[in-house]
């Protein structure tokens, strides 16, 4: 082999890892299949792939909910993105509530990337039960799901509104809510997906449901933000339904490099309008929500927000 042949072979060998490394893979931990947040994860993965010409590939992982997502952030490698209400991250970092015996210094390395549609509490009852308020849920079989923030929030509301030990809690996965409702295994279920939630659409179309509204007094008692699900959002829903909502953020950790965090954040915002054209829940996500993020933002995402002049919260840096 001549000198030039050897040089050409060496050059090709050097190029191979470069082309292979051009594709960055990111794990995106969302929620249970069939939920709003799982569908959002699918949309984000497609948007990031399209917006980066395939240079960043998001692999979507199903999850039992936000508590599991936060726990896994302490043990997963750098390119790991997960969704959670920021309140849960604060609890993890403080070693409180469900994280009391699971404190981990890695929780302090969690950083925000961008907001996604807010949690929307849905208390869904089979229409033929005749239940139209929380008092009517007494003696009924209700599915809360397992391990998710929505399940914990739902249980808190039931206790708060006088239903502690007065409803039967079904031991069924939330992903099976539609089937369980249809076959009479449960009378209702609680889900925290953004509206229009796919599992509520399925239940409303297949069985007929009533979404239980919260009064202004009940909403004030929860200390959450009031949100109104407009009439006509679901089949058979003839009136607006008042409920509560809670912000949700896509997080990563300091193990993700700045360039990847920058590219993810930039592409998310550039693709958001297209996503909103496909799914209405993205229309409510705006740059103004970034200022409400209570914790630190990843330096790569910060770079993008500073370039665009987006207002930031006091703790962002």
Where does each model-flagged region fall?
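Bacterial N-terminal signal peptides that target proteins for export
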Residues: 1-9
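Sec/Tat signal peptide C-region and signal peptidase I cleavage site
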Residues: 16-22
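N-terminal (or domain-start) structured segment
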Residues: 23-91
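Bilobed "Venus flytrap"/periplasmic-binding protein-like clamshell domains
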Residues: 25-51, 56, 115-183, 287, ...
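Acidic, polar ligand-binding/catalytic clefts
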Residues: 80-117
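Pocket-lining segment of extracytoplasmic ligand-binding domains
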Residues: 85-86, 94-97, 102-103, 165-255
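A bilobed periplasmic-binding-protein/Venus flytrap-type ligand-binding module shared by bacterial periplasmic
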Residues: 116-131, 226, 246-260
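An extracytoplasmic/periplasmic, membrane-proximal ligand-sensing/linker region
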Residues: 172, 176, 182-183, 193-206, ...
